A protein has these predicted regions:
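Primarily the internal scaffold of c-type cytochrome electron-transfer domains
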Residues: 151-169, 183-266, 270-273, 289-341, ...
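Short, conserved interaction/coordination micro-motifs, predominantly
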Residues: 284
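N-terminal-proximal low-complexity accessory segments that begin disordered
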Residues: 22-30, 36, 262, 268, ...
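Surface-exposed extracellular loop regions of Gram-negative outer-membrane beta-barrel proteins
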Residues: 351-354
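Membrane-embedded alpha-helical bundles that constitute the cytochrome b-like, heme-associated redox core
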Residues: 2-223, 230, 239
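Feature captures C-terminal
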Residues: 678-680
Length: 690
C-alpha cells in the first residue's frame, strides 16, 4: 500500500504566517519567563544585586510582567486560531500521535491562558494559589508539548539547526534582559521632594526619622520622647523620613475627589460623608476594607469630625499663652505669622488627628475646612505609611515613610482607565513590594496603636507641667490581658493585642483581595463611639457597637443584699432564702466586673466618655419604687447615679467641658474599672409600708 503523498508543510501560507508569528512570540515568552524565574530565584536566595527588591520594583521588571500577560494572551489566541483551522484538516489524514499531541498541546495552551487570566482577577487570593502553580506547570509543559508534537509529525520534523536557532534566540534575548535589568535595578526610587530634602540634609535634621535629639538639647539628660523645637512638626513627636514637610499626596494618595462634590457634602451634612478621600485607589482591590473604614471613627478624625473641629478651632484661637519653647518654634517658622501660638500648640493634637494637614505644613496657617486635606481624617496611608514607632511615649511618636511613593507603573492613573488596570495587574503579579510598603510586622502589635492611644500633656503644650492624658496602652500592658499581671480576676487563654478586639476577622462579602479564608481584619475599629455614627444617621454602625458592648465585656450582678433584720450580707442570692419586709431598709451591693475590656472601662478621654449603672426597684405590678441612674426629661443623667468617668478641672477649678486639654490642671476623681477587675456600688432604699 502506498504512503500518502504530502508536502513538507501541510499548512497553508496564511497559517504559516500565523505559525511564524507565534514562534517569534514564543521566543519572547520563553525569554521573558526565564527572566521572571531568575528574579524569583534571586528573591528566594536573597541575591540583592539582582532581585527585584522589597522596597522598589524596576520598571523593566514591571514591563516584563505586563507584557507577559499581553503577549501570553495574544499567543493563546493565535494558537486557538491555528488549531481551529489546522486540526480538522490533519485529523482526517493522520489520526495518530501527531494529532493526539496536537490536541494535548491545545488543552495545555488553553489551561495556560485561563489560569493566567484567573491570576489577574480579584479571585486570585492566597487560598487560590493552585492557579499559579497550575500556570507554572503548564508553562513548562507548553514548549515540551510543542516539541513532542513536531517530532511526532512524520514529514515535518524540525532540524537540529532549527533547535539551535530557537535556543540561541531565547538565550540572546534573555541576556539582553539580564544586562538591562542589572543596569537599571535600583533600591529606592525617591520622589523629587525627597531628593531635594536629602540634598539639603533634612534627613538628618530634627524632624527626621533617624534624628539624634541629644544634638538639640543643652542638658546632658535627654527625656524620653523629647521633641526638638526645631522640628517642623513640634510639639508633635511625629517625623518623616526626609525630615521635612511632605506633599499631602503622600497621605491622601491624590485621591482628593471632586472639590465641587466635597463642597456639596459640607453644605449638606456639615462635613464630607460620602467621598472616600485618600481611599479611592485602594478600593479597587480592597473593597471590604475601604467600606469598613468609611464607617470608622478613624475616618472622621479631623475637620470632618464636628466635635474635634470645635475643640481644635477653640485651641488655635484661644490657647495663645506663650512659653519659651513655642515662641522659639514660631520664630523659626515664619509662616505662623504674629498670632501663631495657638496654631503651633494645635500640632500637639494634629499628629494623630490631622496628618494630611500637619505633615504637609498646613497647620501653621489658618485652615480652610473645605479642602480635601481638612476633610480627609485618617486615610489609608495615614496608618499604612508608618514604618517606625520611635518609643513607647505615645503622642503620635511615629515616622511616615515619605521618600518614595507607589513604585508601580501608572500609579497616578484614574479609576476605570487602562493605566489603572495595568497598575493593579502589576501589583497582583508582584505584590511583595506593595506588602512591604503597606504592612509592617509591628502593625499586628499593640505598640502600633499605642502611638496615638497613649497621651501625655507637657509644659510646651499646657504651660503648666507634665500630665497624663488617655492611656489605653499602659492599662492594657500592665494587666492580665497582656499576661503581665497574675492578680487579674480573668485571664485570657493567650495574650490579646489591641487588634484582637478592635480588628476582629470580618467576612469579605465584596471580594477583597486581602481576604484569607474569606475574612479580612475589620477596619471598622469598633469601640464605644456612638456620637459620630449618630450624627451621620448610621444606625448599622450603632447596632454593631451595641452588639460589641454586649459581647461579654462587662458583667453586672446584684452580689449581696442585707436588711435591718439580717445585717449580715447574703450572697449568692440565687441559692439563698431571703424575704424582704415592708417598711424595712434594704442595702444591695451591685458588682460590675470588667471581663472583656482590655483596658479601663470606660477608656479614652474619660472626661467626656461616661458609663453608669441604672438600678431600679419595682413591685409585682411593675410600679417603680426606687431608681438610681435615670435620664431626666432634659436628657440629663441623675446626679446621684453611680457613674464611671473622670472629673477634670482647670486652674480655676472649672470643669473641662470643651475637650480643652491645654487647660487641664488636675483630676478631681476618676472612677474606672481596670481590665480583669471589679467595682462595687451600694444602694440603700426603704421598702414602702404597703
Amino acid at each position: 500500500m502506498k504512503k500518502p503523498i504530502r508536502n513538507r508543510w501541510i499548512v497553508s501560507k496564511k497559517l504559516r504566517i500565523i505559525l511564524w508569528v507565534a514562534i517569534v512570540l514564543a521566543v519572547y515568552m520563553l525569554a521573558n519567563t526565564s527572566y521572571l524565574l531568575l528574579n524569583r530565584f534571586a528573591d528566594m536566595a536573597n541575591l540583592d544585586f539582582f532581585a527585584a527588591g522589597k522596597t522598589s520594583i524596576p520598571i523593566l521588571f514591571q514591563v516584563m510582567i505586563l507584557s507577559h500577560t499581553g503577549v501570553g494572551i495574544l499567543l493563546v489566541i493565535l494558537m486557538l486560531v491555528f488549531g481551529i483551522l489546522h486540526l480538522p484538516k490533519v485529523w482526517k489524514l493522520y489520526q495518530n500521535k501527531s494529532g493526539l499531541s496536537g490536541i494535548a498541546y491545545v488543552i495545555i495552551g488553553l489551561t495556560l491562558g485561563i489560569t493566567g487570566l484567573f491570576i489577574l482577577t480579584s479571585a486570585a487570593s492566597r487560598e487560590n494559589n493552585w492557579a499559579w502553580w497550575l500556570h507554572v506547570i503548564c508553562a513548562i509543559l507548553a514548549p515540551a508539548g510543542y516539541i513532542v508534537h513536531r517530532i511526532s509529525s512524520r514529514g515535518n520534523k524540525p532540524s537540529k539547526v532549527s533547535y539551535k536557532k530557537f535556543g540561541t534566540a531565547i538565550a540572546g534575548l534573555l541576556v539582553v534582559f539580564i544586562v538591562w535589568h542589572s543596569l537599571t535595578n535600583r533600591d529606592v526610587i525617591m520622589t523629587e521632594e525627597a531628593q531635594l530634602a536629602m540634598e539639603q540634609g533634612l534627613h538628618e535634621g530634627p524632624g527626621a526619622k533617624n534624628r539624634d535629639v541629644s544634638l538639640f538639647i543643652e542638658d546632658e539628660f535627654v527625656p524620653v520622647g523629647f521633641v526638638p523645637t526645631e522640628s517642623p512638626f513640634f510639639p508633635s513627636a511625629a517625623t518623616t523620613t526626609t525630615g521635612g514637610y511632605l506633599p499631602s499626596r503622600i497621605i491622601t494618595r491624590n485621591d482628593l475627589g471632586s472639590q465641587e462634590k466635597i463642597k456639596e457634602e459640607i453644605d449638606q451634612y456639615g462635613f464630607v460623608k460620602e467621598t472616600a478621600i485618600g481611599a479611592t485607589t485602594c478600593n479597587r482591590c480592597h473593597q471590604d476594607i475601604v467600606a469598613q473604614w468609611e464607617t470608622s471613627a478613624h475616618r472622621f478624625a479631623s475637620f470632618n469630625n464636628p466635635f474635634y473641629e470645635a475643640t481644635i478651632t477653640d485651641m488655635r484661637d484661644h490657647a495663645t499663652e506663650p512659653n519659651m519653647w513655642v515662641q522659639k518654634h514660631v520664630a523659626q517658622y515664619k509662616d505662623f505669622g504674629e498670632d501663631g501660638i495657638g496654631r503651633a500648640k494645635s500640632k500637639w493634637c494634629s499628629g494623630c488627628h490631622d496628618p494630611a494637614l500637619m505633615l504637609a505644613g498646613k497647620m501653621n496657617k489658618p485652615i480652610d475646612r473645605n479642602t480635601a486635606e481638612a476633610q480627609a481624617g485618617l486615610t489609608c496611608l495615614s496608618c499604612h505609611a508608618i514604618d517606625k514607632i520611635h518609643n513607647l511615649t505615645g503622642n503620635g511618636n511615629y515616622n511616615i515613610a515619605d521618600e518614595q511613593e507607589d513604585p508601580y507603573l501608572f500609579a497616578t492613573a484614574k479609576d476605570g482607565s487602562i493605566g489603572a488596570y495595568l497598575h493593579d495587574a502589576a501589583i497582583k503579579a508582584k505584590p511583595d513590594v506593595h506588602k512591604q510598603q503597606m504592612l509592617k510586622p509591628f502593625f499586628r502589635e499593640s505598640e502600633y496603636c499605642m502611638t496615638c492611644h497613649k497621651v501625655s500633656l507637657n509644659e510646651t503644650f499646657n504651660n503648666y507641667r507634665w500630665l497624663r492624658g488617655q492611656n489605653e496602652y499602659d492599662n492594657w500592658h500592665d494587666s492580665g490581658v497582656a499576661l503581665n499581671a497574675s492578680r487579674t480576676f480573668y485571664l485570657p487563654p493567650f495574650k490579646r493585642e489591641c487588634q484582637f478586639c478592635h480588628m476582629p476577622p470580618e467576612e469579605a462579602v465584596l471580594g477583597d483581595i486581602a481576604a484569607k479564608n474569606g475574612m479580612v481584619k475589620s477596619h471598622r475599629f469598633i469601640a464605644v463611639n456612638t456620637a459620630l455614627p449618630y450624627l451621620r444617621k448610621d444606625t448599622s454602625t450603632i447596632n454593631r457597637i451595641v452588639k460589641f458592648l454586649q459581647d461579654d465585656k462587662l458583667r453586672v450582678d446584684v452580689f449581696a443584699v442585707s436588711t435591718e433584720s439580717h445585717p449580715e450580707p447574703m450572697m449568692a442570692l440565687n441559692k439563698g432564702d431571703l424575704t424582704l419586709k415592708a417598711g424595712e431598709q434594704i442595702t444591695a451591693d451591685v458588682v460590675v466586673r470588667n471581663k472583656g475590656v482590655g483596658h479601663t472601662f470606660p477608656g479614652g478621654t474619660n472626661d467626656s466618655n461616661e458609663g453608669w449603672l441604672e438600678f431600679t426597684v419595682k413591685n409585682e405590678a411593675g410600679t417603680t419604687l426606687a431608681i438610681s441612674g435615670f435620664i431626666d426629661e432634659k436628657g440629663h443623667l441623675d446626679k446621684n447615679a453611680h457613674a464611671f468617668k473622670a472629673v477634670i478641672v482647670d486652674k480655676n477649678s472649672n470643669p473641662i467641658h470643651k475637650r480643652n486639654a491645654q487647660d487641664i490642671h488636675v483630676v478631681v476623681y476618676a472612677n474606672v474599672i481596670g481590665p480583669g477587675t471589679a467595682d462595687i456600688a451600694h444602694y440603700t432604699f426603704m421598702l414602702p409600708e404597703e
